[in-house]
Amino acid sequence: MDEKLKELDALFDFFREIDKEKLIERKTYVTGAVRWENDAEHAWHMALMTVLLSEYSNEPIDVLKTVTMLLIHDLVEIDAGDTYAYSGVSKEEQHAKEEKGAARIFGMLPKEKGRKLYDLWQEFEAGETAEALLTRWIISSR
């Protein structure tokens, strides 16, 4: 099979896999509804907030990088599940599950694309760059 077709197959396998993000319920109600928000709705809302709020950052922000970070930051929960404040799961245990999920999910992608998203997820987890800090602030603002 042609290399480009293999890459496209891998990309569409990844797209089908991340559709599962819609099944992960968060412990946040949807405004005006009596149901929990799911991870995909959360990511969409945060991404739009980033587009509109990034100009207010104290530091220059790469908006595309920040939006991408927001769109991928919870993909690991497809494997690890969403952990809320009173779940009883230790931070170490949750991080280990998320790390394993990140390796599997981003590992589905063609090597360069997978590495790029994995590194971006790690940057979010570290919370040290301007983009990661803005991402974390936007998440905490909801």
Name each region found by the language model.
Residues 1-142:
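Alpha-helical, largely C-terminal catalytic domains
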